[in-house]
Amino acid sequence: MNKNGLWNVLKKQFLPGQTKDGEKPKLTKYHYFLFVFVLGVSFMLVSQLFSSPEKTENAKTITAVSSQHSADSKEKTAEVFKASKSDKPKDSIDDYEKEYENQLKEILETIIGVDDVSVVVNVDATSLKVYEKNKSNKNTTTEETDKEGGKRSVTDQSSEEEIVMIKNGDKETPVVVQTKKPDIRGVLVVAQGVDNVQIKQTIIEAVTRVLDVPSHRVAVAPKKIKEDS
């Protein structure tokens, strides 16, 4: 329906016809109000019809973006999980010793004048895990009366500790607050070029700072140069 058709319908419904004397119809406030109301409703219906396809398209776009974001998140989570599973936990003393030895060898060979480095690290034990605990203290006071009628109070103090556990699937695992690395008993570095006093002192200082061990636990010795056969 065009604008003129809509206008004619509204005019017939809400405007009074001509009077018997042929005079022009008089519009009251009621007619103006009713006309504006119907016109506003008509505009709302028309705008809703035109906007519905656009909203549907926007909803489809939002759904597609959300699905893509969810897929990307799952993929990233899977990558992190695979990387975590590939990391081998260090459960033995040998694992810690090998790790320290490889790290020291790699860094010491970058020092000027140092070559062909061999490292031996001796650790005290494996790592120490500190678990979260719930502590509770109890005080019990007992009134005692002896045969002579004397009274005395006896207070008994007791404390209990319980490791905090959390569910991990079908199992319960303790909550780890801190993991302490094992103490190091001694370090031996054998390399070419350490016969130079300054280079030797540099290696000792580097090892003591990296591993947090006193200098008297670090030994540095020159390596024998292999002769060509």
Swiss-Prot record:
Residues 71-93 have a biased composition (Basic and acidic residues). Its main location: membrane. The keyword Lyase does not apply. It is a single-pass membrane protein. The chain crosses the membrane at residues 30-50. This is Stage III sporulation protein AG. GO terms for cellular component: plasma membrane. It is found in: Cell membrane. Keywords: Cell membrane, Membrane, Sporulation, Transmembrane, Transmembrane helix. InterPro entries: Spore_III_AG (IPR014195). The lineage of its organism: Bacteria, Bacillati, Bacillota, Bacilli, Bacillales. Residues 64-93, 136-159 are annotated as: Disordered. It comes from Bacillus subtilis (strain 168). It comes from the Bacteria. NCBIfam families: spore_III_AG.
